[in-house]
């Protein structure tokens, strides 16, 4: 027999996990490490740090890895250390007391869907503001003890790690996460095997493992397709956040929405409200519709239940934030759903179009979300108005200010973002019930009782911590790039912790105008090089790898920072993440934000700064429109002076320079004999006492319950009880009205006011007789009056005068309205007829409108 050169079969590798054994006295630490409660409890973080401070820094503050890598000798030493063991006992007792409180069942239960969650820099499943907001929301849901769960993705590579080349070019690196080293756990089925959720695409299934991140009392379920059950084309679905092409994005959104609902079903979880945090998750409603139809309801009946229990939060007016898919691509993966729903393909695709009959229009997830969610909200008061205008084409019979799009202004999770030094001050001077009543401004007024020098010392301590951290980061990056050591030393020496420090740190999208400060380089050079009043600017942020313009901004700022007059005065910090963000929002003196108004939907980094005595300098956009108080920060004028954006940029830059030169810098350096500025501390105290209490995540969560969750849950309950009787009745009523709508007509009218005009102070009666085609008082009428002084297609509703039904005979209903004009001028008016039913959530719930002659 001939002997081959080699003869080897293919090994069948199996996953093998070997865990480090903890002594019995320390086993509670494993439970602590696997619950992200430690991410916002500073005593828990201090405990892990005390186990081995050097190792804690090496493992980048990951307690799971820390416990795995503790040496046997160190574990034995910890057990014998009475001080550490007391800390272990105390922190674990605090944790168990927190966890053992039963959830508040009086409030609506919620399932929360989002593409990203920023919980800790250890768990890289976030990229920016949306994820930070979602992570903070789950933490506050836990603290407030509400009944909530969440669904997202466990990304193999997450978002990219950023570094800069020697010439300032952004380098994006995707590092694989080792799931066994993260504060998460596999979800197992009833047989103890990893749970698998099978998600249907048109002709096949994608198989997702399910993991759970324990966020205090809240369970966050994370889907993972990177497994051997899937093809090479589907394993990457959960590889990268916002990575891949549009086909992969669609596959992600199918997995999040449809797969998310299937996951909850498999876990036996039902909630009152389903909250789509951005349009990425909108397809969760498609699966819910399928479930109701499979249970015996018609499509229209199912839609009543799904809409009533769904909320869509939109986070941006920027077009790039709204996903559109070609019909061909959408059909490739969603072709089987019309049959499941009992509708046509055109009807399904039409739910994602502003004009359902326009076959050239792409399917938009945001539009689908609006059409399948009863309520829609923006994330600040201004953004709510912008969203009303943006979505107005969906409800053509109503003007933007009339539609139902609301708002809840974003907040931030106080325990996560308030530095430990500030937590000590708040604990010392504030009411003991502070954490349960964070939105109470009266409690925050206690900041005025804190001695000025204590606040100044706290601010200086945090500034020095920031400078030390920056020096470490800079040394690492310059060594990595083999930079000139002499230049590194020169730069580090120029970073003066006593200087006025200004931070501009956020995602580098062009509308955020990171370039604004560099409009007049010579003027900026004078500002930063004043020897008596030094000023430092810190920039940090990532640009999407596909955003060439954003990367160009980073390169430009980096190049300017390397010029001799700006070296050590303008500093760009690589790899903006949660850890760096916490340092910056507590360490600088001024937080600067310069977006193009009104493109900043909310912007929460400035709110985080408020919790740390850092004062805002910002365009009046996003949350700052509501937050700004005179004497508690600075704002650029709200009014836009120039339509030409370049001219507006120059004006805004000049305004910033002027505020710095004439107001901010002189105020900061107006020092007393003790070496600090009393006037500056006054601004800090005003900022904390009058602004901070209104921008906590506690207030945001309460707003969602008060404005949406509780009301929707109550309505859903009414629709669903008695075998969905009311849902069926409303669906039938809508179908009947829709069938007869075109036939409903005016029999007679008396409209002398709108036909001939009128005079102020005089009363006019208008009447209409309407043939309702057998419907029983099913329509309403109102006179809509517009101001006639606006150009183009802009409209402003001046007044709406409702008609009252006075009498009816058979199908004929008589409506009348008495109107007394109170202002002279030119107006436009028309009578609007609409379907009327007390069981509708709002007018846009059934958006049939007929304008009458």
What are these regions (language model features)?
Residues 1-853:
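Catalytic cores of carbohydrate-active enzymes across secretory and cytosolic contexts
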């Amino acid at each position: 027999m001939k002997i081959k050169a080699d003869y080897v079969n293919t090994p069948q590798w199996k996953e093998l996990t070997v865990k480090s054994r903890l002594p019995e006295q320390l086993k509670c630490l494993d439970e602590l490490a696997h619950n992200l409660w430690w991410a916002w409890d500073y005593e828990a973080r201090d405990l892990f740090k005390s186990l081995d401070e050097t190792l804690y820094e090496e493992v980048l503050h990951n307690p799971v890895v820390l416990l795995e890598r503790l040496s046997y000798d160190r574990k034995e030493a910890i057990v014998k250390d009475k001080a550490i063991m007391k800390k272990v006992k105390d922190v674990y007792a605090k944790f168990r007391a927190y966890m053992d409180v039963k959830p508040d069942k009086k409030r609506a239960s919620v399932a929360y869907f989002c593409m990203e969650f920023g919980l800790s820099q250890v768990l890289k499943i976030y990229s920016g503001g949306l994820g930070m907001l979602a992570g903070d929301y789950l933490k506050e849901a836990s603290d407030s003890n509400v009944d909530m769960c969440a669904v997202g993705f466990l990304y193999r590579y997450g978002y990219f790690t950023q570094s800069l080349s020697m010439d300032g070019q952004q380098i994006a690196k995707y590092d694989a996460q080792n799931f066994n080293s993260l504060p998460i756990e596999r979800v197992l089925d009833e047989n103890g095997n990893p749970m698998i959720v099978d998600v249907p695409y048109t002709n096949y299934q994608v198989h997702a493992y399910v993991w759970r991140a324990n966020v205090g009392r809240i369970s966050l379920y994370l889907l993972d397709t990177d497994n051997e059950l899937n093809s090479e084309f589907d394993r990457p679905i959960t590889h990268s956040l916002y990575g891949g092409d549009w086909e992969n994005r669609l596959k992600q959104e199918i997995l999040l929405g449809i797969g998310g609902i299937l996951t909850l079903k498999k876990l036996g979880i039902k909630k009152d409200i389903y909250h789509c945090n951005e349009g990425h998750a909108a397809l969760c409603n498609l699966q819910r519709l399928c479930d109701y139809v499979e249970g015996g309801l018609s499509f229209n009946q199912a839609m009543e239940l799904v809409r009533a229990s769904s909320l869509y939060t939109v986070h941006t007016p920027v077009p790039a934030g709204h996903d559109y898919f070609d019909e061909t691509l959408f059909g490739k993966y969603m072709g089987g759903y019309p049959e499941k729903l009992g509708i046509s393909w055109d009807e399904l695709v039409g739910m994602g179009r502003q004009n359902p009959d326009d076959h050239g229009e792409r399917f938009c997830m945001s539009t689908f979300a609006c059409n399948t969610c009863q309520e829609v909200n923006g994330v600040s008061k201004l953004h709510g108005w912008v969203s009303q205008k943006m979505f107005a084409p969906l409800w053509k019979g109503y003007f933007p200010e009339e539609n139902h799009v609301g708002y809840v202004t974003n907040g931030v999770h106080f325990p996560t973002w308030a530095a430990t030094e500030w937590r000590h001050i708040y604990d010392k001077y504030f009411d003991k019930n502070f954490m349960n009543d964070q939105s109470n401004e009266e409690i925050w007024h206690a900041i005025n009782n804190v001695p000025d020098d204590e606040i100044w010392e706290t601010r200086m301590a945090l500034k020095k911590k920031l400078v030390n951290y920056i020096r470490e980061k800079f040394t690492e990056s310059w060594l990595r790039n083999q930079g000139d050591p002499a230049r590194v030393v020169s730069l580090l020496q120029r970073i003066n912790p006593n200087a006025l420090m200004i931070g501009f740190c956020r995602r580098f999208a062009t509308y955020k105008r990171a370039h604004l400060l560099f409009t007049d380089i010579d003027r900026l050079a004078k500002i930063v090089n004043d020897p008596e009043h030094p000023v430092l600017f810190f920039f940090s942020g990532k640009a999407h790898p596909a955003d060439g313009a954003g990367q160009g901004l980073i390169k430009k700022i980096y190049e300017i920072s390397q010029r001799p007059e700006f070296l050590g005065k303008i500093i760009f910090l690589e790899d903006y993440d949660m850890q760096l963000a916490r340092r910056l929002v507590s360490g600088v003196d001024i937080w600067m934000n310069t977006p193009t108004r009104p493109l900043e939907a909310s912007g929460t980094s400035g709110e985080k700064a408020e919790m740390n005595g850092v004062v805002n300098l910002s365009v009046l956009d996003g949350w700052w429109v509501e937050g700004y108080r005179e004497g508690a920060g600075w704002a650029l004028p709200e009014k836009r002076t120039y339509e030409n954006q370049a001219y507006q940029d120059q004006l805004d830059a000049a305004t910033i320079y002027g505020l710095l030169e004439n107001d901010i810098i002189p105020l900061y350096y107006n020092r007393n004999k003790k070496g600090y500025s009393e006037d500056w501390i006054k601004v800090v105290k005003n900022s904390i006492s009058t602004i901070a209490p209104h921008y906590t995540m506690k207030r945001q969560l309460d707003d969602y319950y008060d404005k949406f969750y509780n009301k929707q849950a109550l309505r859903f309950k009414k629709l669903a009880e008695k075998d969905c009787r009311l849902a069926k009745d409303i669906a039938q009523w809508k179908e009947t009205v829709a069938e007869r709508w075109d036939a409903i007509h005016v029999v007679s009218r008396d409209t002398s006011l709108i036909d001939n005009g009128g005079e102020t102070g005089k009363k006019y009666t208008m009447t209409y007789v309407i043939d309702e085609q057998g419907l029983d008082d099913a329509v309403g009428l109102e006179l809509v009056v517009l101001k006639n002084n606006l150009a183009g297609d802009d409209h402003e509703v001046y007044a709406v005068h409702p008609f009252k039904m006075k009498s009816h005979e058979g199908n004929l209903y008589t409506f009348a309205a008495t109107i007394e004009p109170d202002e002279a001028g030119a107006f436009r008016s028309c009578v609007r007829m609409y379907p009327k039913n007390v069981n509708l959530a709002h007018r846009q719930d059934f958006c049939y409108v007929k304008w009458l002659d």
